[in-house]
């Protein structure tokens, strides 16, 4: 009798849970259907903005003087573009002697390192303005698995390998002379991995560094603007990392392409700080995101999530450093840049108002002015 009663209670409990689950699923189905209609309407309205300053911008079509392929130690082919200076400037001789010692040339090369799910086009406006000025030799490359570069044959991507890939690019394209490294997001992390492996380059060849919207570690603590209930979890995205690395690219691709409109809205939400950014800019960033294969995305997640290289920043203390971040960055929040400053106490720090993670695109004029002023302090 007692067992029968317990069985009845369990049965009612199960029916109750099933009923609740059914209600949740039903509400979710209605919500999804309504959400799809709403998102498409919102995207159409957003893209029709008549005052978009970048509606006619030729993203991804900037000129270069040389294009080449650099092959890394693990056999990955990297696509590289080089822009030569028109007149060129030299670094201040006393500055170079103090920071790096004797150099065969005082003309610097600026090497740009882009972030996750992006490509060299991330630095579109910096490249455009510096090319117009004609003062600096510049090197741009697509990271492994991104843009026009090749993919790793097997296994997961690792930041130490990205650091070695950067070294391969430097050895091939800047065999001599001073180097200024500029890294955004994962590009900054790549620079840290490079510094961890080759600290001798800093204060010898690398005479200055620029870290934009990046982090030295503890990305697992980032809440990414998630609702408070989810964000209370110590590592809210850990299940995603563990699951994504086991999924096939096809599974993730189907999920990513289920709604390109949703992808556009998410890009605007997480990439930008302004509530009404340029639709053309949002589309450009979303296109770079979508060109990165789902397989590449999954194979990068673990190394980014476990990135911890604050000690590597010690190597960067030997030369001037600039740290830039948008005050509304939800991917690598301001606190991450502030932590970098604790390890680089002499670095310049600029927090750009009303800007998100792609600050160098969203507020290009401000970032260009900041970067050029920093570079001019190094020149004669």
Model-found features: residue ranges?
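N-terminal cap/lid segment of alpha/beta-hydrolase-fold proteins
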Residues: 55-87
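Short beta-strand/loop motif that positions the catalytic acidic residue
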Residues: 316-317, 323-325, 329
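Hydrophobic alpha-helical topogenic segments used for membrane insertion/localization
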Residues: 13-43
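Conserved HGGG/HGGXW glycine-rich cap/lid loop of the alpha/beta-hydrolase fold
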Residues: 74-151, 172
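Catalytic active-site module of serine/aspartate enzymes centered on a nucleophile-bearing elbow/loop
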Residues: 2-5, 342-380
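Active-site loop/oxyanion-hole signature of alpha/beta-hydrolase fold enzymes
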Residues: 137-190, 194-204, 369
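Flexible "cap/lid" loop of the alpha/beta hydrolase fold
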Residues: 200, 204-251
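Conserved alpha/beta-hydrolase catalytic His-Asp/Glu region
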Residues: 245-315
């Amino acid at each position: 009798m007692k067992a029968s009663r317990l069985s009845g209670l369990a049965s009612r409990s199960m029916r109750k849970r099933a009923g609740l689950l059914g209600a949740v699923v039903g509400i979710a189905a209605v919500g999804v259907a309504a959400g799809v209609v709403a998102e498409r309407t919102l995207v159409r309205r957003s893209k029709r903005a008549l005052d978009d300053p970048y509606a006619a911008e030729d993203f991804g079509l900037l000129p270069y003087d040389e294009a080449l392929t650099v092959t890394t130690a693990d056999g990955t082919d990297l696509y590289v573009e080089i822009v030569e200076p028109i007149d060129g400037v030299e670094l201040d001789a006393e500055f170079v002697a103090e920071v790096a010692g004797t150099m065969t040339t005082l003309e610097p090369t600026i090497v740009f390192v882009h972030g996750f799910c992006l490509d060299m086009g991330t630095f579109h406006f910096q490249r455009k303005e510096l090319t117009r000025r004609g003062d600096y030799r510049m090197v741009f490359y697509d990271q492994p698995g991104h843009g026009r570069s090749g993919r790793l044959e097997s296994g997961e991507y690792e930041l130490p390998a990205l650091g070695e890939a950067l070294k391969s690019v430097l050895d091939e394209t800047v065999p001599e002379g001073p180097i200024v490294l500029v890294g955004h997001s994962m590009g900054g992390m790549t620079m840290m991995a490079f510094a961890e492996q080759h600290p001798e380059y800093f204060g010898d060849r690398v005479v200055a560094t620029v870290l934009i919207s990046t982090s030295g570690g503890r990305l697992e603590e980032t809440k990414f603007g998630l609702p408070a209930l989810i964000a209370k979890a110590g590592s809210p995205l850990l299940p995603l990392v563990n699951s994504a690395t086991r999924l096939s690219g096809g599974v993730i691709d189907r999920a990513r392409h289920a709604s390109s409109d949703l992808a556009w809205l998410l890009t605007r939400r997480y990439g930008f700080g302004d509530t009404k950014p340029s639709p053309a800019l949002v589309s450009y960033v979303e296109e770079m995101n979508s060109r990165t294969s789902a397989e590449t995305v999954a194979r990068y997640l673990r190394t980014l999530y476990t990135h911890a290289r604050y000690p590597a920043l010690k190597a960067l203390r030997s030369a001037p450093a600039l740290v830039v971040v948008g005050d509304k960055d939800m991917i690598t929040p301001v606190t991450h840049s502030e932590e970098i400053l604790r390890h680089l106490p002499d670095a310049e720090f600029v927090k750009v108002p009303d800007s998100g993670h792609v600050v160098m695109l969203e507020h290009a004029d401000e970032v260009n002015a900041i970067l050029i002023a920093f570079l001019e302090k190094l020149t004669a």
